[in-house]
Amino acid sequence: MTDSQPVNLDTTCTDTADKNLDKSNVKITNKMLDKNAETLEYLSVDDYDYELPDSLIARYPLAQRSASKLLYLATSQQKDSDSQIIDKQFSELADLLNAGDLIVFNDTKVMKARLFGQKDTGGKIEVLIERLVNISDLDSTVLQLETTDGKSINQEHIALCHVKASKAPKLGQRLEIADGHMQAVVIGRQENLFILAFEAPILPDLERYGELPIPPYFERHADATDNTRYQTVFHDPAKLASVAAPTASLHFDKLVLDKLAAKGINTAFVTLHVGAGTFAPVKTDNLLNHTMHSEYAHLPQVTADLINQTHANGKQVIAIGTTVTRVLETAYQKTAVNGKALSSWAGDTDIFIYPGFRFGVIDKLLTNFHLPKSTLLMLVSAFAGKAAIEQAYQHAIDNHYRFFSYGDAMLLDKKTKVQAQTLNKQ
């Protein structure tokens, strides 16, 4: 990050291929494109770049969750460039919503998924647990189920992991983790992930020896404060599977929740277990060439019913964060077809939302400020309008808002009024 310059999320493409792109030949893979949108604009990842002073990166939480600022972007229903920006405090959120509206939270819990250790050769390693899996779910042809010295391997405790090391560990190699309190063997690879077989149940050992995987831009190790503040106040302890927090929810405390309830604003929950891919940069020049990471998600029927009833009553559904957005819009594509009502759904989602996407469920989005060139910045640009997001980010920088996971929040209106409707498959 460099010293502040005017935010411009609409920079000219510098890549020759992008400049000369024949847009008539581009295949749009998004299943939900707004027929009124210029769907082939803003395809260059450089369109989502901006400059941010390092001093505005929030590396520690405020003393009180709801003490953060809230930028309300009241988007015009006609042009996304005619938007009103209102500075509020997060504790005033209820004032911006109406009785009968529905807020949807993500109830996942963050694992202490970061571990440190060494290979049996002595080389240091850092392990980040991405997902716990059953060995039966893996491709057996890529697995080596014995150590380099021919010993059998415990196949009950398997995880997909990121491993940092000066030299990548080999198949069958033993890893000593947490000063020897945890042992694992490399039994395979799945794309950029290592498949590790642990000697003992993984989750209890993570709680004892693991470190909370706070974002890399914090530039520090997790401390005792993070163990509380990098979790939401309403997480489900049984849903311990994320490697990053649903950060928009970190602002909520009892004060805010009580105000929402007192006003008659309803709440519901979905689950999305956040993977490390949420921090992964987009490495392609053209966003249509980006491969989106996949995460497990679940929309329960009780929440689907509340959403359907809320819309039937003419009220709004407010997604708390991009993770909730991805769950609800995926479930809409999967279940709300041919005029059917939204219904329960569970599975992996790799939905990629960028300008031109036609939202089927959410009416407002509460979110934090996102990293340059990130898929999350593309998502909010799709929702509120790219020009409006550009204005809001410049306003936030000029007024010293705090950015990223421990930063301030923004409440976004949808760019156009689109009611939940039948999926039009491309």
Language-model segment annotations:
Residues 2-10, 34-426:
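Surface-exposed, charge/polar-rich loops and edge strands
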